[in-house]
Amino acid sequence: MSSGGLLLLLGLLTLWAELTPISGHDRPKFCYLPADPGECLAHMRSFYYDSESKKCKEFIYGGCHGNANKFPSRDKCRQTCGASAKGRPT
Protein backbone atom coordinates (compact mmCIF):
# COMPACT_ATOMS: atom_id res chain seq x y z
CA MET A 1 0.00 0.00 0.00
CA SER A 2 1.33 3.45 -0.85
CA SER A 3 2.17 6.01 1.82
CA GLY A 4 -0.77 8.14 0.63
CA GLY A 5 -3.11 5.20 1.09
CA LEU A 6 -1.74 4.52 4.55
CA LEU A 7 -2.22 8.16 5.52
CA LEU A 8 -5.79 8.09 4.25
CA LEU A 9 -6.49 4.89 6.18
CA LEU A 10 -4.95 6.36 9.33
CA GLY A 11 -7.03 9.52 8.92
CA LEU A 12 -10.24 7.55 8.47
CA LEU A 13 -9.51 5.38 11.50
CA THR A 14 -8.79 8.47 13.59
CA LEU A 15 -12.03 10.10 12.46
CA TRP A 16 -13.98 6.92 13.20
CA ALA A 17 -12.46 6.71 16.70
CA GLU A 18 -13.41 10.32 17.42
CA LEU A 19 -16.99 9.92 16.21
CA THR A 20 -17.73 6.48 17.65
CA PRO A 21 -20.12 6.80 20.60
CA ILE A 22 -18.95 5.85 24.05
CA SER A 23 -21.11 3.07 25.42
CA GLY A 24 -21.74 2.59 29.11
CA HIS A 25 -19.28 -0.30 29.12
CA ASP A 26 -16.47 1.90 27.79
CA ARG A 27 -16.78 4.73 30.31
CA PRO A 28 -13.86 5.19 32.67
CA LYS A 29 -14.70 3.86 36.13
CA PHE A 30 -14.30 7.30 37.68
CA CYS A 31 -17.38 8.47 35.73
CA TYR A 32 -19.45 6.47 38.23
CA LEU A 33 -18.03 8.24 41.30
CA PRO A 34 -20.28 10.76 43.08
CA ALA A 35 -19.54 14.47 42.89
CA ASP A 36 -16.93 15.34 45.51
CA PRO A 37 -16.34 19.04 46.21
CA GLY A 38 -13.13 18.31 48.12
CA GLU A 39 -11.96 19.98 51.30
CA CYS A 40 -10.80 23.42 50.16
CA LEU A 41 -12.89 26.55 49.68
CA ALA A 42 -11.90 27.82 46.22
CA HIS A 43 -15.51 27.71 44.89
CA MET A 44 -14.69 26.59 41.32
CA ARG A 45 -17.54 25.91 38.88
CA SER A 46 -17.02 22.34 37.66
CA PHE A 47 -18.97 19.46 36.15
CA TYR A 48 -19.36 15.79 37.02
CA TYR A 49 -21.02 12.85 35.30
CA ASP A 50 -24.16 11.67 37.10
CA SER A 51 -24.42 8.01 36.14
CA GLU A 52 -28.06 7.71 37.31
CA SER A 53 -29.39 10.51 35.09
CA LYS A 54 -26.70 9.99 32.42
CA LYS A 55 -26.06 13.75 32.41
CA CYS A 56 -23.13 15.99 33.13
CA LYS A 57 -24.16 18.25 35.98
CA GLU A 58 -22.67 21.34 37.51
CA PHE A 59 -21.22 21.40 41.02
CA ILE A 60 -18.87 23.60 43.01
CA TYR A 61 -15.37 22.17 43.47
CA GLY A 62 -13.31 23.46 46.36
CA GLY A 63 -10.02 23.23 44.48
CA CYS A 64 -8.25 20.34 46.22
CA HIS A 65 -8.75 16.62 46.83
CA GLY A 66 -12.12 15.37 45.56
CA ASN A 67 -12.03 12.61 42.95
CA ALA A 68 -11.45 12.19 39.21
CA ASN A 69 -15.12 12.74 38.30
CA LYS A 70 -14.69 16.50 37.82
CA PHE A 71 -14.28 18.47 34.64
CA PRO A 72 -13.66 22.14 33.83
CA SER A 73 -16.49 22.18 31.27
CA ARG A 74 -19.67 20.32 30.41
CA ASP A 75 -18.19 19.51 26.99
CA LYS A 76 -15.12 17.85 28.53
CA CYS A 77 -17.40 15.82 30.80
CA ARG A 78 -19.45 14.69 27.80
CA GLN A 79 -16.34 13.80 25.80
CA THR A 80 -14.94 11.72 28.64
CA CYS A 81 -18.02 10.05 30.09
CA GLY A 82 -20.31 10.02 27.06
CA ALA A 83 -23.28 12.09 28.23
CA SER A 84 -25.28 14.02 25.68
CA ALA A 85 -27.07 17.33 26.02
CA LYS A 86 -30.32 15.41 26.50
CA GLY A 87 -28.82 13.08 29.08
CA ARG A 88 -28.64 10.01 26.88
CA PRO A 89 -25.33 8.25 26.24
CA THR A 90 -23.79 9.42 22.99
From Swiss-Prot:
Signal peptide: 1-24
UniProt keyword annotations, A-Z: Disulfide bond, Protease inhibitor, Secreted, Serine protease inhibitor, Signal
Site keyed Reactive bond for chymotrypsin: positions: L41, A42
Disulfide cysteine pairs (residue numbers): C31-C81, C40-C64, C56-C77
Record localization: Secreted
Keyword 4Fe-4S: no
Record-level GO cellular component terms: extracellular space
Tissue: Expressed by the venom gland.
Proregion residues excised on maturation: 85-90
Domain BPTI/Kunitz inhibitor: 31-81
InterPro entries linked: Kunitz_BPTI, Kunitz_BPTI_sf, Prtase_inh_Kunz-CS, TFPI/VKTCI-like
GO molecular function list: serine-type endopeptidase inhibitor activity
Main location: secreted
The protein's role, per its UniProt record: Serine protease inhibitor.
PANTHER family for this protein: KUNITZ-TYPE PROTEASE INHIBITOR-RELATED (PTHR10083), SERINE PEPTIDASE INHIBITOR, KUNITZ TYPE, 3 (PTHR10083:SF376)
Family: Belongs to the venom Kunitz-type family.
This protein's name: Kunitz-type serine protease inhibitor B5
Species per Swiss-Prot/TrEMBL record: Daboia siamensis
